[in-house]
Swiss-Prot record:
Part of the 50S ribosomal subunit. GO terms for cellular component: cytosolic large ribosomal subunit. GO terms for molecular function: rRNA binding; structural constituent of ribosome; tRNA binding. Belongs to the universal ribosomal protein uL1 family. It comes from the Bacteria. CDD domains: Ribosomal_L1. This is Large ribosomal subunit protein uL1. The gene is rplA. Binds directly to 23S rRNA. The L1 stalk is quite mobile in the ribosome, and is involved in E site tRNA release. One of its GO terms (biological process) is regulation of translation. Keywords: Repressor, Ribonucleoprotein, Ribosomal protein, RNA-binding, rRNA-binding, Translation regulation, tRNA-binding.
Amino acid sequence: MAKLTKRARLIREKVEATKSYDINEAVALLKELATAKFLESVDVAVNLGVDPRKSDQNVRGATVLPHGTGRDVRVAVFTQGANAEAAKEAGAELVGMDELAAQIKAGEMNFDVVIASPDAMRVVGMLGQILGPRGLMPNPKTGTVTPNVAEAVKNAKAGQVRYRNDKNGIIHTTIGKVDFEPAQLKENLEALLGALKKAKPAAAKGVFIKKVSISTTMGAGVAVDQGTLEDAK
């Protein structure tokens, strides 16, 4: 507990809760405060000007970050025939149909992303109660239900992040690791915000990107001045 108390005290001393920081200053603060004994992720929370109670204002999608996320992503693909070979060549760890579904039903879930070709959804659909709660259910909006499974595998491996606003209208995702260069984290964040702006629902009125905060896995959030980000202006 002493270490947690010391870290909490340091955060209080260094981070002004009501201040929005220049992106470079915010990243420098995160790096200074990242004292965990493991390599922490850099996470982002984006408050959107949407009413999540209305289906036409929910935001969901995916984008490939220019510098990836720093994670090794294991991919499972539901497909068959030529698509199965293409998925394997693209780097998918697990490829199959009914036999892959049987593995998942048996509790074997050694993967981070699930991709499916449209003809495989008859099999994947039966796994909704298993994959859905884990956020793994393939969906056309995130590019994980597609006839071009090879491209989807490559995107997942290249550092694609999926996003979906929660019940409070906030997007939570990862933009890298704390050992990334500041410029890499900035460019990843700008790429995410650019994708979010393109995904703005027509029904959403007023300011769309209301607040942007970044944090490490074990750290406090640091608000970012959007004026210092290219794609948030």
